[in-house]
Every structure is written in structure tokens, then in C-alpha cells.
Regions:
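Sec-dependent N-terminal signal peptides
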Residues: 4-13
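N-terminal signal peptide c-region/cleavage motif recognized by signal peptidases
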Residues: 13-19
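Cys-dependent protein tyrosine phosphatase-like superfamily
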Residues: 19-214, 226-307
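Ser/Thr-glycine-rich phosphate-binding loops at phosphate-binding pockets of nucleotides
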Residues: 219, 223-224
Length: 307
């Protein structure tokens, strides 16, 4: 796969995992970004808002825009990190992925609290015990903002049972269906457990009544990124844009960066082992292997690709 690196220092600071990494010449705007204090960077990283300076930087890096040429793919939902719309990418036959149908983000509430305690069954070892429900990240105003701006109907939560301890409904509110589906990422995406969770997840995207759908784990990076990679590949998004969309997660947090590159390579390698000349065809092979038909793939594309 052709590799591309983001022209933001914090995004490529740990890019040593890429053997082909080349440090680019920085523009004046990028140098100004690097001069920001850590607190200022954090403010920019945390959920870049519509048409912010960061979004403009992405735009100048040939990021493909939605059909109107104006809308950034970053979305602002107060309190929620790393939120963006799949809409605006270019897919099969040059068709644009529809906006407002699939959102990816960090979780709408914190993980449940946990602590390590002595494991009575295994002397000398510790085990993690989960307790209490994770604190909500949304205010009432933020929930109202979501209803007015996104209208999410389905909250697809990819976190573990422990992370979602004591949860029974979506933090977005009673009008949203919470679907808890513990899922895998990267190389584990191709394990039997990974395939079973992906089968549950993909079925949701075949029913138009479920849309708009929000997909998240805790950070919106690994588990979310792996599922979104499959969905985008099925829609015919180019290899370059698949990689760039994964890299964009590094924008929102200084702790999510290219250190995960070897794991991402396992995801790419897993698809490369499947039948198909292109990533799109390999994604089709994966979906067929977990029990879906060509008609299902066509249905998903009809929902997600603009005419």
C-alpha cells in the first residue's frame, strides 16, 4: 500500500514504525501549529470543530470534500472526541459517500471504573474488577445539539462487557437504540471471534431504518477504525484515503498516533490475504466469508453512495 504521512509534527513524531517515512518540509502554517503550547494543541486535538484551522490543514493535503465542497468531515458534538462523518469520501465509480449516515467517534460516556484485586483462584495474580457505570460525557444541551444536528438513531458500541458495566441504554437518550457489540481490531478482526462480531455489526448497516448510525469504542481508534476500514473499503474508497482516514485519529489526541502502525499493518495484511485484486474486492471476500451475499453488499452501497 502506498503510504502517506500527515504534515503535522505530533502525528509523525513517532512515525519510526514506517520504514518508508520521509520528513516533509513544513509550511509556515504548520510551523505555527507546532509553536502551540501543549494545552493549545490539546484544545485543537480534542474534537476538531467544523472548518477549524486543523480541518483547513487537512483540506490543503488533498483531502476529498463532500459534494458541496464546503463541509468538513469533522463533526462537533460537545464533550465527544474524534467525531467525524464518513460522508464526502470518493468511492466506487467516483460516487461520493453520503453525509449524515454514519458517524465515528469516541465513546459517549467514560468506561466503567475498575480496579485490580487479588485473584483468589490464581494466588499471586491480579484480576480486573469492573464496578459502576462510566460517567456520561454529554450534557443535556449536548444531547439536544445531537438531536438537532445529527439525529442519530443507532448507537453501535464496540466496547467490552466490562467497559460497559451497568449500561442498559445509550447515553445519547431514549430516542436512540443502544447496540452493544464487543468487537475486535487489527489482526484479531480476522479471528473467529472477530468475524462473529463483524457479522453482528454489518447486519445493522443493511437496514436503512437504523440510520444515522454512530460507531464508537472508547477512543474511536482501534476497534472503530477496523470496522470503518471495512465499510469504507466496501464503498470503494482508495487505499490512500483509507490510510489517511485512519491517520486522522492522531489529530484528536497526543496519545493516539503512529505507534499503532504495526497493528494497522496487520489489518491491511489480513485483507491482502483474501481473494481479490483490490482492497475493495478483498473486503467483499471478507463480508462473503461471514455469511453475507452480493445482494447485501449492493444494498449497503445503495444506502451509502450518492447516485
Amino acid at each position: 500500500m502506498k503510504r502517506r504521512v500527515l504534515l503535522v509534527a505530533l502525528a509523525f513524531a513517532s512515525a519510526g514504525a514506517f520504514a518508508t517515512h520521509v520528513v516533509p518540509v513544513l509550511t509556515a502554517e504548520q510551523k505555527a501549529f507546532l509553536a502551540l503550547s501543549a494545552a493549545e494543541r490539546r484544545a485543537v486535538f480534542t474534537n476538531a470543530a467544523y472548518r477549524t484551522k486543523l480541518a483547513d490543514s487537512v483540506r490543503k493535503m488533498n483531502w476529498r470534500e463532500p459534494a458541496d465542497g464546503e463541509t468538513s468531515r469533522w463533526r462537533r458534538l460537545p464533550g465527544i472526541p474524534n467525531m467525524r462523518d464518513l460522508g464526502g469520501l470518493k468511492g466506487l465509480d467516483g460516487r461520493t459517500v453520503a453525509c449524515g449516515r454514519i458517524f465515528r467517534s469516541g465513546a459517549f460516556n467514560d468506561n466503567a471504573k475498575s480496579e485490580l484485586v487479588d485473584d483468589a483462584d490464581h494466588p499471586g495474580e491480579k484480576k480486573r474488577v469492573w464496578k459502576e457505570r462510566g460517567k456520561d460525557r454529554l450534557t443535556d444541551d449536548a444531547r439536544k445539539f445531537q438531536i438537532e444536528n445529527f439525529g442519530i438513531r443507532t448507537d453501535l458500541d464496540l466496547r467490552t462487557d466490562g467497559e460497559c458495566n451497568e449500561m442498559t441504554a445509550s447515553p445519547l437518550g431514549p430516542q436512540v437504540t443502544w447496540v452493544h457489540s464487543p468487537s475486535q481490531s487489527y489482526g484479531s478482526f480476522f479471528s473467529n471471534v472477530g468475524k462473529a462480531s463483524t457479522k453482528r455489526n454489518f447486519a445493522l448497516f443493511l437496514d436503512e431504518r437504523n440510520y444515522p448510525i454512530a460507531v464508537h469504542c472508547i477512543a474511536g481508534a482501534d476497534r472503530t477504525g477496523s470496522l470503518i476500514y471495512l465499510l469504507e473499503a466496501l464503498l470503494g474508497v482508495s487505499d490512500d484515503d483509507l490510510l489517511l482516514d485512519w491517520e486522522l485519529t492522531a489529530f484528536y489526541s497526543s496519545t493516539v498516533n503512529f505507534a499503532h502502525a504495526p497493528r494497522y499493518d496487520k489489518l491491511v495484511a489480513g485483507f491482502a490475504r483474501l481473494p481479490g485484486r483490490t482492497t475493495c474486492e478483498q473486503a467483499e471476500s471478507y463480508v462473503r466469508s461471514i455469511g453475507f451475499t452480493d445482494e447485501d453488499i449492493v444494498r449497503f452501497r445503495k444506502i451509502m453512495l450518492c447516485p
